[in-house]
Amino acid sequence: MESLNILISNDDGVFAEGIRALAKSALKKGHKVTVVCPDQERSATGHGLTLQSPLRVERADELFDKGIKAWGCSGTPADCVKLALSELLDKKPDLVLSGINHGPNLGTDIFCSGTVAAAMEGTLENVPSMAISVASFKWKNFEFAGEIAMNIAEQAIKDSWPKSLLLNLNIPPCERNKIKELSWTRLSIRKYKNQFSKREDPRGDDYYWLAGEAVLDLKSKGDGPKNWPSDVSQIQENKISLTPVEPDLFWRGSIDVLPKINTSFINAS
C-alpha cells in the first residue's frame, strides 16, 4: 500500500519498549512515522488534559530508529495527540496509533486508559485511530505485537474504516503459534474487589494504594451484531480482540424506562 503519515503516542512514556517497537514496525512497512508521547509514565490518566500549567516538548529522535521524528511531552497522552495535531505536525496524519501498551485495556477499564484516550483524540479529529495493548504486564514480545497491529491497521485503512470509530486492539500474551484467531468483540463490564490497600505511615496517618483485582466481567446489555463475545473472554482463549468504540456515549434505550422528572420546581416561588 502507499506510504502513510502515522502519528504514534502512548501512556507508558517515551522510554517504553512498546512504543519503540510499534514505531519500528510502522517504519519497516515504509510509512512516515512521527512520535509524540509523554516524557514519563502516564498510565491510567484517562482523557485528562493539562490546563493549569504550560506544555513543554523536547525532541527525542535518538530514542527511536533513524528516520523517526519524536517528541517527549510534559502532558498527558491526550495532550500529546492534541498538541501534535494542532502544532507539531506539518499536515494531518492518515492514521493515529497509541501503544503498544504494557498491559491490557479491556472492558470498561478503557475509561481510565491513557492509551485509549490518545487514540480517541485522533478519532475526535476524524483521523482513523487505533489503541494497541498486550494483555499482560510481563510479556515483552512487542515486535510480534507491532507486526499484528500494523497488519490490522493497514487492512482497516484500505477497507471501510468509519472515521467515527476507534479500534481497540488487545493481543493475548502468547507466541504466534498459540494465537487462535481474531475476533470482533464488545466491551465487558469489569468489577473489582479490594480496590484500595490501606496502610499507615510512620506518623500514624492512613494512606491508600489503588490495587484492585478484577473478579467479574459482566455481559453488557448491548451485545452488538451477532451477539459478539466480550473482549475479556477472547483474550482468555488466546484470541486477538478488536473492539470498535464510539466517542458518542449517548444512551440508546427507550425513553419509557427513564426516571420521570417533575419540573414544577423550576417556576416554584
Swiss-Prot record:
Q: Which residues bind a divalent metal cation?
A: D11, D12, S43, N101
**Function description:** Nucleotidase that shows phosphatase activity on nucleoside 5'-monophosphates.
Q: Which GO terms describe its cellular component?
A: cytoplasm
Q: Which InterPro entries match?
A: SurE, SurE-like_Pase/nucleotidase, SurE-like_sf
For this UniProt record, the keywords arranged alphabetically read as follows:
Cytoplasm, Hydrolase, Metal-binding, Nucleotide-binding
Q: Where does it mainly reside? A: cytoplasm
The free-text note explaining how the cofactor binds reads: Binds 1 divalent metal cation per subunit.
According to UniProt, the name of this protein is 5'-nucleotidase SurE
As recorded in UniProt, its EC number(s) are 3.1.3.5
Question: Disulphide bridges in this chain?
Answer: none
**Superkingdom of source:** Bacteria
Cofactor(s) listed: a divalent metal cation
Single GO molecular function: 5'-nucleotidase activity
